[in-house]
Amino acid sequence: MQRLFLLVAVMLLSGCLTAPPKEAARPTLMPRAQSYKDLTHLPAPTGKIFVSVYNIQDETGQFKPYPASNFSTAVPQSATAMLVTALKDSRWFIPLERQGLQNLLNERKIIRAAQENGTVAINNRIPLQSLTAANIMVEGSIIGYESNVKSGGVGARYFGIGADTQYQLDQIAVNLRVVNVSTGEILSSVNTSKTILSYEVQAGVFRFIDYQRLLEGEVGYTSNEPVMLCLMSAIETGVIFLINDGIDRGLWDLQNKAELQNDILVKYRHMSVPPES
């Protein structure tokens, strides 16, 4: 009877856990958070604004903890590409290529040289237009990455049978600011942050079921929220705040004035007051 009880207990504990995947997942589009849905459902502007983004730097100086790698940064170095994508997805801005500007200029030189020599391809015979200048620049940086901001757990064990769970919260922070190209004035600035959740669940049994017979078993899994997705969400949230702030300051306007009370704009307007630490 005792053995049966132990066997049932182990089966119940293991049933609470997720089985490991049997095969690798297929390539797919990057998952997105609620901030992406809010960003893509903003009301339309009076007109789209030409914007340039040069480089969003990592100013945290943080590296992945041992034993990962002492030379791998704790946050992704692709914030510039993420910001360009967020600006385009908002349908409020027309991003201009600036990160790969030198590559673009080289291609234009090649086309002009071919046009002068008369060896240009059919699709490049039309004279090149001048590059479009931006109305504003969006600058910024990753200003903070704090690990183990909060951690905790809970567990229980009875006669060698038990389970426990632990969690840890990290935090990443981003600064974005809008700069007037004509004057260099900073028109708007915002700081956003996103927590990164990691947790672990374990269950096991360790008990002698008979003389010189030991029953021992462990099951468990861990889940780590991708830093890349959290950084993308923080940037998308920052873009929404910049758009909302620009509407309030009269920097740009809505196509339909009645959309000023749009649910998304109202929600982020209420969130514009930073919470107490």
Model segments located where?
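N-terminal segment of the mature soluble domain
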Residues: 49-50, 54-148, 171-188
